[in-house]
């Protein structure tokens, strides 16, 4: 079996406080993009993995291996699987590529191994693998996330804009981003849920500046090449541009795909780009 593992962008990301356990509470809107890894699953006696990107570990530290092991433990089985990851989504980019891979492994192996684990069990496994893994496991379109990013509300809608996503060849560690972002816990924030529902229903772009990303200012100060990408996007037709997650990837929303493609010409040729059509929803190709 073969499955696509799609990436995401964050449309707005508010860090609202720090928890006693050391994690931060946040609010964000997850939106899927048509940039994906492909995972091939083949029957085997043990769990193993190979990857087209030699920079990624394929040992027990890999999230795909961790996901398979977690399923084994939760179900009390010793089933095997041979996984091949065709890595296309940049890592260290704020696009959730590793989390999406892990969610895909959970979904596919729950089926292939005939475990039929309930939603709550899968959610508990997913959260331990990564805060945004539940989004990729249970949603296909836009979702509101609270808590540490694990409390989800599927909004049953999609963005009416083409999305140009840009990776400027910088890897920003999430740990670094949380240590260095400029704290604005006391700010009164707009309701992201209401904002994005209105945006998707009406296409009215006037509220787009309200979708701020709290990582952006610190990242831009430390990584000026990342800041420059946002400037290029806004100067070349983007209705809105922002950092995704903790970066370094950025995205621009465009009225149509033609304008998004035209904007690529303004970017350095070494930067990796992806265009997502309006109203995109995820379909991993498995029918699950």
UniProtKB/Swiss-Prot annotation:
> Reaction catalysed by this chain?
4-CDP-2-C-methyl-D-erythritol + ATP = 4-CDP-2-C-methyl-D-erythritol 2-phosphate + ADP + H(+)
Q: What is this protein called?
A: 4-diphosphocytidyl-2-C-methyl-D-erythritol kinase
Query: What is the gene called?
Result: ispE
UniProt-listed Enzyme Commission number(s): 2.7.1.148
Q: Which GO terms describe its biological process?
A: isopentenyl diphosphate biosynthetic process, methylerythritol 4-phosphate pathway; terpenoid biosynthetic process
> What's the family?
Belongs to the GHMP kinase family. IspE subfamily.
Example GO molecular function = 4-(cytidine 5'-diphospho)-2-C-methyl-D-erythritol kinase activity
General function of this protein: Catalyzes the phosphorylation of the position 2 hydroxy group of 4-diphosphocytidyl-2C-methyl-D-erythritol.
Which residues are involved in binding ATP? 90-100
* Keyword Membrane annotated: no
> Is ATP-binding set as a keyword in this record?
yes
* Swiss-Prot/TrEMBL keywords: ATP-binding, Isoprene biosynthesis, Kinase, Nucleotide-binding, Transferase
Pathway(s): Isoprenoid biosynthesis; isopentenyl diphosphate biosynthesis via DXP pathway; isopentenyl diphosphate from 1-deoxy-D-xylulose 5-phosphate: step 3/6
Which residues are responsible for catalysis?
A: 8, 132
**HAMAP family xref list:** IspE (MF_00061)
State the Pfam families in the record. GHMP_kinases_C, GHMP_kinases_N
The protein's matches in PANTHER family, at most eight in alphabetical order, are given as:
4-DIPHOSPHOCYTIDYL-2-C-METHYL-D-ERYTHRITOL KINASE, CHLOROPLASTIC
InterPro entries, sorted: GHMP_kinase_C_dom (IPR013750), GHMP_kinase_C_sf (IPR036554), GHMP_kinase_N_dom (IPR006204), IspE (IPR004424), Ribosomal_Su5_D2-typ_SF (IPR020568), Ribsml_uS5_D2-typ_fold_subgr (IPR014721)
| Transmembrane segments annotated in the record for this chain | none
